[in-house]
Amino acid sequence: MWGAIIKGDVEEVKQYLALGEDVNLRGLGNMTPLHRAAQNGRKEMVELLIENGADVNAMTDSGETPLDWAINSRHVKLYPQIRKHGGKTGEELKAE
């Protein structure tokens, strides 16, 4: 599924999800598919993953959320999209 997310192939990711692939699958550094989609600025992919149960506040080993990755990659269009689903930064979560 990782390759499809990086390519931005929404249809391929839909197929993986239909086959039962874990939307919150953990990769290197404990990142999730949503982290990678946010880092790559894939708005449609971000929405698909969230609609399928992606944890918007999943944290990497370094304490970063998908919103942090969108911010660090300067994908401004994703900030409100992730926020409307309850997404926070790692710092915000630590402060709670």
Please state what every model-predicted region is.
Residues 12, 44-45, 77-78:
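Conserved ankyrin/ankyrin-like repeat signature
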